[in-house]
Amino acid sequence: MKHVKRGNVISMCIVALLVNISISQYCLAVTTEEELKNWPLSCYTADELNKVREWEKTWVGKKINQDNIDQVKEFMTEQFYNMFKNPKDWGVDELWFTIVPYQQLPVTPGQVALTKKHAPTAKLDPNPRKCFWKEGIGPNEFLMGWEKGETAGFPFPFPKSGIEMAWNLESNTRGDTKSLDRVGVVVNPRTRVERRAVQPWLFDYFTGRCDAPPTPNKPKNPKGIRRAMYLFIEEPLDVQGTRYMELRYLDVKKSDDVWVWFPLFRRIRRMGFSYKADTIDGSDLAPDDEVGWNGHVNLKTWKIIGRKELLVSRHQDLDQLTKQTGQAVWNGYMMERTNSYVLEAKWKDKNAVYSRELLYMDPEDWKCLQKVAWDRQGRIWRQFFFNTMVVKSKQGIVQPHNYELYSSDLQRRHGGPSLDKIVEIGQTIHNRFWSIQNLQKLGY
């Protein structure tokens, strides 16, 4: 009997040792300095790019509409194809775009330097963590050093799992500090009615800053703010003067703070965390949908489905975009082939607004290119485009900028073509701006 017990103890020790070794190996840095020597890389290998260039000899400069879209259908999501194949459903007789040559997106000098500094030591925590959402954070989900603001750049430039890719998405600080004017319309193509929206926005990252001083973190941040966001509604007139401020924290035990100034009551109201899943001012866009996912990485599970070549707008000339009244999608997109990753996201909360999301990720700067979302019943619901142009910051740094966050409801069939017009990138915003007192002052 003693021998049996001793054997059981030895077996348990061996199993524990093997589990410990496997966890340790999983959490070792996945990126080596040797790999980073030639980074950043194109989304295509040399051989793949040669094939793309041959294809471009036939297609670059061609106008694509419902008559010839079937010939390039393989480079689209089903939802994008259906939209441009059936333009009358979206308020116009013809939807069209043109094909342009592929160009590699620039990665900023700060992103390159900080990625090469931090990626070789980036790893996921082998231990579970408690957080403000009941589903918790499992082993090998949380980026170590994140809660202290010790990370910057892309932690996993060569991701091997969905969670690593999601951390790359979260780590893109998009110019560090940015102000823009979002001007667009929500269109019902059946009635051709448009509801105009004008919203100045501010974004300010407190940690992981790459190019705009101070880097990598803003000083005097006792609350541990990760990112701050502010918007003011100028139009439509019925909600003019509404102001929204959102603070996300590094500490996963601390829920996001969302404050809204309502001019009608001249009062500030603190909104619940679930408010971020509600759409903004009658559009199809919720705060959570910004940039593909605007929330804590570990609220969802992430899985790489594979690769998908897409035609996407990454080097757009805004003067080429046109639309008629009642048209729910822009004409004139300049589309180039891009070899994206397909990243599946599912909320851990089974009662969340989406049952499933597919994010098409750009492997050159780890931004979301397009997103498709399913409702709680598993039906296709919403489609998003995160279209890009190349701009310069206040510091003269060339970088990608999402000039449009397009959202559409595929069930009720309406959409929101818009433009995010840059005011400034890389400006200085004092920490005092991000306070309830200042939000109230701005309201008065």
Task: Spell out what each predicted region is.
Residues S11-S22:
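Bacterial N-terminal signal peptides
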Residues K346-I422:
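C-terminal soluble interaction/assembly domains
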Residues I23-A29:
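Sec/Tat signal peptide C-region and signal peptidase I cleavage site
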Residues G332, Q411-G443:
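Low-complexity, Gly/Ser/Thr/Pro-rich intrinsically disordered linker/tail segments
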Residues M1-V9:
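N-terminal secretory signal peptides that target proteins for export/translocation
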Residues P128, A197-P222, E234-E235, E290-L359, ...:
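Extended beta-strand-rich segments in extracellular/periplasmic secretory proteins, especially
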Residues E147-D181, V185, V193-R196, L250-S255, ...:
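Flexible, processing/modification-adjacent segments and terminal tails
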Residues V30-S255:
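Solvent-exposed N-terminal domain segments of exported/luminal and surface proteins
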